[in-house]
């Protein structure tokens, strides 16, 4: 096991918060590992005066970080999963995610509590074509203007009257401790589906880095990891970019997704059974620090808490046509459900 890890991340305050949350998880399992944060300025951070769809999409927030990973200048990278394209360059992989935060969007406005309450021809600041499509579906009269920058800068623009309202992710507002219920109002899923992967912190590594893979196996939040599969499959199949209005949100239909799986042991083992069960549940592999022995691989059986419902949205390039679809599937076939939805909805949009 390595003694230190170089963690690549963007330099924004929110990205650094995300990175420290990952470090907290790593330290729980590997308290002696030294974690060095390597801040990286990305092209997406430098270009703030143009919408993302005009300059290469969200991948611009990853390009320099992924290159540092490929060049072995860093050992792992931390991203907001919503910024990660459906197709990841070889030999990189999303190997772990943290538990998902509430992925809803927030209507931010000083005078009004909802999009419906805004006066005729009001201006909403947003550069996301997904949000623009939903806004225009609810209120075609509203004007949507390009609105780039980090969370703090967008709120400052709102406060100075540059726009009448904006829409931001709840996760960022909460983690930056700037969610104010006086002018921040949660938007329900029925009105606006979130961005794919919204609310999820992702860890990217090189596939052949066994040391990082072992760490990721420990910190990975399995219920969230399974939950995002249909969303990501939908995104990957469509190879969607920032010009395409697209959204998806998955949730467990069962009451308690934390108790997602049970482990079936295939050989007699030695050691403290409680410690073994804990180690196996968290990583699905041996944990040499416990001194326990069991045959790998463990067979993972998904029980009743395994049904996922995913709501999908896809629009055409100008947002004039939007289609919705819902898939309910067993956890073992959730990826296929995302692909199925993509095929059906693409056909509907193209008609």
Curated annotation (Swiss-Prot):
Q: Name one GO cellular component term.
A: cytoplasm
**What miscellaneous comment appears in this entry?**
The porphobilinogen subunits are added to the dipyrromethane group.
| Any one Gene Ontology BP term | protoporphyrinogen IX biosynthetic process
Kindly state which reaction or reactions the protein catalyses.
Answer: 4 porphobilinogen + H2O = hydroxymethylbilane + 4 NH4(+)
Classification lineage: Bacteria, Pseudomonadati, Pseudomonadota, Alphaproteobacteria, Rickettsiales
Give the signal sequence positions. Answer: none
**Oligomer and partners:** Monomer.
**Top-tier EC class:** transferase
- Cofactor binding annotation: Binds 1 dipyrromethane group covalently.
Q: What is this protein called?
A: Porphobilinogen deaminase
Keyword presence, Transferase: yes
**Entry function:** Tetrapolymerization of the monopyrrole PBG into the hydroxymethylbilane pre-uroporphyrinogen in several discrete steps.
Q: Which cofactor does it need?
A: dipyrromethane
The record's annotation in Pfam families points to: Porphobil_deam, Porphobil_deamC
Query: Any idea which residues bear S-(dipyrrolylmethanemethyl)cysteine here?
Result: 242
């Amino acid at each position: 096991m390595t003694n230190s890890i170089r963690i690549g991340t963007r330099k924004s305050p929110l990205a650094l918060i995300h990175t420290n949350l990952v470090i907290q998880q790593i330290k729980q399992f590997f308290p002696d590992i030294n974690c060095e944060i390597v801040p990286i300025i990305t092209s997406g951070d430098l270009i703030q005066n143009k919408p993302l769809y005009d300059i290469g999409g969200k991948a611009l927030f990853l390009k320099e970080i992924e290159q540092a990973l490929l060049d072995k200048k860093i050992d792992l990278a931390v991203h907001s999963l919503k910024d990660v394209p459906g197709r990841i360059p070889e030999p990189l992989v999303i190997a772990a995610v943290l538990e998902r935060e509430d992925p809803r969007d927030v209507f931010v406005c000083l005078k009004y509590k909802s999009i419906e309450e805004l006066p005729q021809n009001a201006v909403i600041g947003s550069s996301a074509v997904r949000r623009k499509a939903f806004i225009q579906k609810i209120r075609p009269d509203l004007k949507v203007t390009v609105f780039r920058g980090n969370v703090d800068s967008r709120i400052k623009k709102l406060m100075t009257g540059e726009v009448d309202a904006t829409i931001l992710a709840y996760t960022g507002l909460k983690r930056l401790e700037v969610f104010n219920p006086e002018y921040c109002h949660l938007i329900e899923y029925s009105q606006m589906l979130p961005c794919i992967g919204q609310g999820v912190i992702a860890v990217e590594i090189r596939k052949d880095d066994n040391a990082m893979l072992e760490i990721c196996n420990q910190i990975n939040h399995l219920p969230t990891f399974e939950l995002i599969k249909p969303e990501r499959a939908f995104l990957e199949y469509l190879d969607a970019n920032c010009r395409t209005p697209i959204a998806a949100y998955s949730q467990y239909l069962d009451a308690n997704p934390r108790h997602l799986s049970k482990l079936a042991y295939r050989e007699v083992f030695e050691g403290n059974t409680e410690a073994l069960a804990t180690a196996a549940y968290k990583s699905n592999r041996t944990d040499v620090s416990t001194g326990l022995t069991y045959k790998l691989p463990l067979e993972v059986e998904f029980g009743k808490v395994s049904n996922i419902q995913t709501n999908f949205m896809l629009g055409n390039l100008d947002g004039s046509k939007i289609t919705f679809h819902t898939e309910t599937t067993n956890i073992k076939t959730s990826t296929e459900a995302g692909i199925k939805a993509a095929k059906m909805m693409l056909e509907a949009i193209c008609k």
